[in-house]
Amino acid sequence: SVQVSHIRSRLIEHGLSVRHCIWEKSNPSPMNGQHMWLSSIENCVYARKKGAYHDIRERCKSAVWKCPTEKYKGHPTPKPISLMERLIQASSKPEDIVFDPCMGSGAVGIAAKRTRRSFIGIEMDEKYYNITQDRIDKAVSGIGEKVDITSFL
């Protein structure tokens, strides 16, 4: 999408190493009946500082990751927390900072906290920001951590 392309370009401009993988949904659901083919994949873009940690066990594996969609009613396109945890663990170490420029349902924030990373997220839609703030706060309260979430700007 245009938004992903724009974000990818900005990350590269700032000297980050940008990678791409595909999420293949093992249980896709149709958004509407007007399309002939069911969309069962989503592109994932992730970036890290050049020379930063990368889990050697993830090398030479397929860039297509199969994972079921997450059942979460607070957002139209929630990402699976387990998939976000895999991305985070493959490309960072505990105590590193994870940045999500499109927080959506908060899956990256929850995954970051579950894997002992700090988290910075941005969400343009105030409705989803508020939902995400509450969701992340509830998720991390179960692991004994407090979340400091800056108010919507």
Regions found by a protein language model. Give the residues of each.
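Core catalytic lobe of class I
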Residues: 1-130
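S-adenosyl-L-methionine
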Residues: 133-153
